[in-house]
């Protein structure tokens, strides 16, 4: 298994697939899966390539989900090991995407290969949902594939997302949910004027201060067993012309909430609207919902993954819902149990991104054992 995982990971890393350009990564994976008897379906949307591959039939449907796109490298001269050469030094595989998440993809593919070779007539269905649009807009990737599958009445029962979930050691963290994310783009109206004649103008910054104080101090909820309390942060504020003698005519405030399952996005929107009305502000607001929160409570999938980590890696993981959003939020809409397990995340999106070769091999064995636990 070791040689296959590392070789595939290196071949994927050597393709500079900066989002949403797949650079042939999915074709490489599809060719391997097709040799095993997987049915291959391409789902291109605009400039994004997506792959839906299946082996077997019936329930349960176990999907491996991941992305071939990577974030830009930044200044390549800052890299000790070039970002697309996939060098191995002292058990570390270097390159953009090594941890996020071409290493996981390689481990998933080889784990499935090993399982299908040993169990060609396995129960249920093993599937792959792979996109090249996770790191950027996330508009034409997993979300579009999920919409297509749901429209056809297809179902995913269990989904393993290979995002780099681990913190200090491989498998110490398993993500069994994620907070929702909603952004408000708020424009508060004023009246432009000269700072020496404030009675002839209306300063939207001054008017908005009491509202902003209430907004930032508001306690949305207390969280629960699986989620921390909902958090609001102001991300951007802009007003004025840049001149020191002009009262601004408009104030722009952008804020984001990472919210738990105790509240809904509708509750958040209604609460903000009530605050704005209370403070008598003239405004317009545009909302952008990046994703609703989801939670996979301990059950078949969580138990299978925890058991796999304990038996293969000797690690008892902590279940966690922290961090940003992932494509798991879209797959959860299908009613699937979703967890995320992947390599250490300490170097993702950084210069000299890297992953332990030993960890990738272990990860492949864990994914394989998960299939055994769910299908045998």
Curated annotation (Swiss-Prot):
Could you say which residues bind Zn(2+) 2 here? 100, 135, 349
Indicate whether Cytoplasm appears among the record's keywords: no
Catalysed reactions, as listed in the record: N-succinyl-(2S,6S)-2,6-diaminopimelate + H2O = (2S,6S)-2,6-diaminopimelate + succinate
Q: Extract the Gene3D superfamilies matched here.
A: 3.30.70.360, Zn peptidases
PROSITE patterns tied to this protein: ARGE_DAPE_CPG2_1
Keywords, sorted A to Z: Amino-acid biosynthesis, Cobalt, Diaminopimelate biosynthesis, Hydrolase, Lysine biosynthesis, Metal-binding, Zinc
On cofactor binding, the record's note says: Binds 2 Zn(2+) or Co(2+) ions per subunit.
Molecular-function GO term, any one: succinyl-diaminopimelate desuccinylase activity
What EC designation does it have?
A: 3.5.1.18
Q: Which NCBIfam families match?
A: dapE_proteo, PRK13009.1
The subunit field of the Swiss-Prot or TrEMBL record says: Homodimer.
Q: HAMAP family, from UniProt?
A: DapE (MF_01690)
Stated role: Catalyzes the hydrolysis of N-succinyl-L,L-diaminopimelic acid (SDAP), forming succinate and LL-2,6-diaminopimelate (DAP), an intermediate involved in the bacterial biosynthesis of lysine and meso-diaminopimelic acid, an essential component of bacterial cell walls.
Q: What is this protein called?
A: Succinyl-diaminopimelate desuccinylase
Q: Which organism is it from?
A: Actinobacillus succinogenes (strain ATCC 55618 / DSM 22257 / CCUG 43843 / 130Z)
């Amino acid at each position: 298994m070791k040689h296959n995982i590392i070789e595939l990971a290196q071949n994927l890393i050597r393709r500079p697939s900066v989002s949403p350009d797949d650079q042939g990564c999915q074709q490489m994976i599809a060719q391997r899966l097709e040799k095993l008897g997987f049915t291959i379906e391409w789902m291109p949307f605009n400039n994004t390539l997506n792959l839906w591959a299946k082996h077997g039939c019936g329930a349960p449907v176990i999907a491996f989900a991941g992305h071939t796109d990577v974030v830009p490298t930044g200044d390549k001269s800052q890299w000790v090991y070039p970002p697309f050469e996939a060098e191995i030094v002292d058990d570390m595989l270097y390159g953009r995407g090594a941890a996020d998440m071409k290493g996981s993809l390689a481990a998933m593919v080889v784990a499935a290969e090993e399982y299908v070779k040993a169990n060609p007539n396995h129960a249920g269905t093993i599937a792959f949902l792979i996109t090249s649009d996770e790191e950027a807009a996330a508009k034409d990737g997993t979300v579009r594939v999920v919409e297509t599958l749901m429209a056809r009445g297809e179902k995913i029962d269990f989904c393993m997302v290979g995002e780099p979930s681990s913190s200090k050691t491989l498998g110490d963290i398993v993500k069994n949910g994620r907070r929702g994310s909603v952004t408000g783009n708020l424009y508060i109206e004023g009246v432009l004027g000269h700072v020496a004649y404030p009675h002839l103008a209306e300063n939207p910054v001054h008017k908005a201060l009491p509202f902003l104080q209430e907004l930032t101090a508001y306690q949305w909820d207390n969280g629960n067993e699986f989620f921390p309390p909902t958090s609001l942060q102001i991300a951007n504020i802009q007003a004025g012309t840049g001149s020191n003698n002009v009262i601004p005519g408009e104030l722009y405030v952008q804020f984001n909430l990472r919210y738990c399952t105790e509240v809904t996005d509708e509750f958040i929107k209604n609460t903000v609207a009530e605050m704005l009305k209370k403070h008598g502000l003239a405004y317009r607001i545009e909302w952008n919902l990046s994703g609703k929160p989801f939670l996979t409570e301990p059950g078949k999938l969580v138990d299978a993954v925890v058991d796999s980590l304990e038996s293969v890696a000797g690690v008892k993981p902590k279940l966690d819902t922290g961090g940003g959003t992932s494509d798991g939020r879209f797959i959860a809409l299908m009613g699937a149990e979703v967890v995320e397990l992947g390599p250490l995340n300490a170097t993702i999106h950084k210069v000299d991104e890297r992953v332990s070769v030993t960890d990738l091999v272990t990860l492949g064995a864990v994914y394989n054992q998960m299939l055994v636990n769910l299908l045998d």
